[in-house]
From Swiss-Prot:
The keyword Lyase does not apply. GO terms for cellular component: cytoplasm; DUBm complex; nuclear pore; nucleoplasm; SAGA complex; transcription export complex 2. Belongs to the ENY2 family. It is found in: Nucleus, Nucleoplasm; Cytoplasm. One of its GO terms (biological process) is positive regulation of transcription by RNA polymerase II. GO terms for molecular function: chromatin insulator sequence binding; transcription coactivator activity. This is Enhancer of yellow 2 transcription factor. InterPro entries: TF_ENY2, TF_EnY2_sf. The keyword Plastid does not apply. It comes from Drosophila grimshawi.
Length: 94
């Protein structure tokens, strides 16, 4: 089991995963990431629709790498700090 799997499993069991997910969703909305990804999807659909229809799987495979690069470093750092805080609190409790 990797460290990511262990952290993921712990956050699910402790109930903190929902808090982390909510924080991520809020930050992505605040920084405009959701709108950027929406526009990215729209542009891909417009570009591809001229040729033929685009499946959801094709859209996801094309958008995902680009969307990941659009996540601001500040959001990534804040999430990492939150996860570290949760894990540190766990160590203190044990």
């Amino acid at each position: 089991m990797t460290i990511c799997d262990t952290v993921d499993q712990y956050t699910i069991m402790s109930g903190d995963r929902l808090k982390i997910k909510d924080l991520l969703c809020n930050r992505l909305t605040e920084c405009g990431w959701r709108n950027e990804v929406r526009l990215l999807c729209r542009n891909i659909l417009l570009e591809k629709s001229a040729n033929n229809s685009v499946s959801v799987d094709q859209l996801i495979s094309e958008v995902t790498p680009k969307a990941r690069t659009l996540v601001p470093d500040a959001v990534k750092k804040e999430l990492l700090m939150k996860i570290r805080t949760i894990l540190a609190e766990t160590d203190e409790d044990n």
